[in-house]
Amino acid sequence: MSEVKYWIASISKEHTKRGVAGNFIQVCRGKQAPLNRMKKGDYLVVYSSKLSMEGNEKCQAFTALGKVSDDEAYSFQMTESFTPFRRNIEFFECEETSIIPLINDLGFISNKKSWGYPFRFGFFEIKEKKDFDLITSKMLKDEIARQYL
């Protein structure tokens, strides 16, 4: 089995709620390529910069945490003209966690003044497990739950 990887997806809080309810993730306006980078067993943290995709109200929090539970991306016809790609995710019960107090300690944020820059791409790998551990230590208050990550 390949090495477990850790990912962040930037998704509005509103869309995150839909994904959690349906046990799926959709990123980068439905593109397949980013989803294909994940493998079954990888972990995913969702960061929501805004409450809704159309609005401007800030959220700036990690809003969901889960594990990839399928083998590949699949298409899903949402409307007659929009068929995005998705991955199935086993989401964990967790607490929404503000990014603000974590910025200085997250290694993937190299420029602390422009801390939002990495999230503009919509999807990226967390290269250092300590960053994933820091985020999940705030999202999962239950010590037992953290043992399974």
What are these language model-derived features?
Residues 58-129:
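Aromatic- and Lys/Arg-enriched surface recognition patch
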